[in-house]
Amino acid sequence: MAENSDITSLEDSFRKFAIYGDTKATGQEMTGKNWSKLCKDCKVNDGKAVTGTDVDIVFSKVKAKSARVITYEEFTKALEELSAKRFKGKSKEEAYEAICKLVAGKEPVSAGITKAAATGAVDRLTDTSKYTGSHKERFDQTGKGKGKSGRETIVENTGYVGSYKLAGTYDAKVKK
C-alpha cells in the first residue's frame, strides 16, 4: 500500500477538496461535484482511459445507497477502482500507489476567477487630482475627502464678504 506520509497528504488533499466551494463543509465528507473536481485537477481524469463518466460511475458505486457524499474510506475505495482503470498495465498495488501520488498534496485550482479591472474611464473619474471647479475643493492635496467642510460653505457672520482679505483691519486704521 501507500506510505504513511502519502496517506496523510492524501487525507489532507481529501479535506481541501471536500471543503472547496462550500462554506458549511467540515472536510469529513466530499460531494460528487468536488470528487469530479479532484479527479480533473489531479489529472486522474485523463479523458482517454478515465473519463468524466467513469469518475461519476465510481462515485455512485462507492457511496452509500441513499447518501449524496462519500467519506475518506469510500474515497480510498474509489481511488482503488479508478487506479485499475487509469493504470492498466500495472498491478493493483502499483496502480493504487501511482494514483495516490497523483492526488497526494494537491489543492483545488481556482481557474477563471475574474478580478476587478480598472479601465481608463474608471481611473479618470476616480482620480481626485484631475477634478476641476467646485469638486476640486472637496479634497485636500493627498486626495482624501475633507468631509462636510468640502461639501458645504460654512457661513461666518463677520460682516464681511467671503473673499475679502483685510477682514478685521479696519479698527487698526481708524485708531490712528
Curated annotation (Swiss-Prot):
InterPro entries, per the entry: EF-hand-dom_pair, TPP/p25
Tell me the domain of life.
Eukaryota
In this chain, the stretch annotated as Disordered covers 132-151
One GO biological-process annotation of the entry reads: microtubule bundle formation
One GO cellular component from the entry?
microtubule
What the protein does?
Regulator of microtubule dynamic that has microtubule bundling activity.
What does the sequence similarity comment in the record state about its family?
Belongs to the TPPP family.
Q: What is this protein called?
A: Tubulin polymerization-promoting protein family member 3
User: What organism does the UniProt record list as the source?
Assistant: Xenopus laevis (African clawed frog)
Gene (UniProt): tppp3
